[in-house]
Structures are given as C-alpha cells and as structure tokens.
C-alpha cells in the first residue's frame, strides 16, 4: 500500500485530537471496486486511545458492513516513523501535534483535512492499594516516591506532556532522577498498576479504564 496515496490522520493529546486525510489510496480504491467480503481499513492509533478506538470502530462497522477495521496500536512516535517508512495505514491517530506536523511536512497528509476533535488531560496516578498520598504533581517529590513511570518523551506524547507539566512546576530535574520510561502510555499504566512504579503520569482516559489505579 502506498501511504502517500491515502491516509486518514487523527490527532489526540492533552491539547486536542485532530483529524486529517491523505487523498486517494489503496483502501479508497478498494472501496470503489466490487469484491468479496469486507474492505480492510487499517488504523494506526496511539496506545492511549485503544479502548476508545475499539468502541468507535465497533459502532462504525455496525453501520458499515462493507468495512472491517484492523488496528495497530503503539506510541505515536513509532507509528509516525512506520508511516514515513511506508508502513500500511489508512487511518493515523496520534496523541500529539508533533507527529502529525512531521507527516504534514513530508506531504503525507492531504491538504485541508486536519480537524481538531477533542481534548484529553494528563493525570497523576498510583496503584489502588498504594498508601501514598499524592494530591498534586508536586507531591512526586515525596521521599517515599522512588520510581515515577513516564512515557519516553522523544516518541511518546504523554511523556512530552508530562515533561511540560513538571517544567512549569520547576521540578523536572528532580523528577528525571526518579523516572522510569515506558514505550507507550499503556506500559506506564501497567507499571503503576503492578507497583513496579510508585506513581505514573497517564491520560485521564487511561486511568478511567483501569480499576487498579486511583
């Protein structure tokens, strides 16, 4: 599949979720050509949107029987690089502007198709059975907190947003000394759930789907 022919791009983040397309690709052509069975729509999406995308996808498939959605979830940075290298994707859902801008600069998005969709928030979480009391982000400086799970800031948007928060609070260097970096937001969530990290920074939507964190 030639990704330069067709790519629908969605952008989500602590700021907002944006949508866009790259015109006329393989899946679009397949939809114009009668064939047996449903057309596969390949969706590359940020791991933070796993649950939301599957729920939306199920509703879409219910109303569009000719389409079957195939998902590829991962960090936005890794997905961006895969698309740039020609990886198959019809839909891209990123968790930050940075990755979408990079694709735009390389002419992988169709002109005028990016649309802001929604807002998400980053939150500080601990395991449900944790005895730590962390009422705000500054509380991570508590000596009892020795490991803070964060997304890897170069390729994981939630990690970028986390660094922005701690930078504004003037405590980024102290946080880095305690940080352990996950390859995507779901790894950050998992480490916090299991207690491998004392706390973590994830999207509010990730915290909401877990009954193992607070």
Name each region found by the language model.
Residues 114-122:
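Short, glycine-/small- and polar/acidic-enriched structural segments
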Residues 106-113:
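A short, gly/pro- and small-residue-rich
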Residues 90-94:
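Periplasmic-binding protein-like
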Residues 21-62, 77, 81-85, 96-97, ...:
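Exported/periplasmic ABC-transporter solute-binding proteins
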Residues 1-10:
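Bacterial N-terminal signal peptides that target proteins for export
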Residues 15-20:
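C-terminal motif of bacterial Sec signal peptides marking the signal peptidase cleavage site
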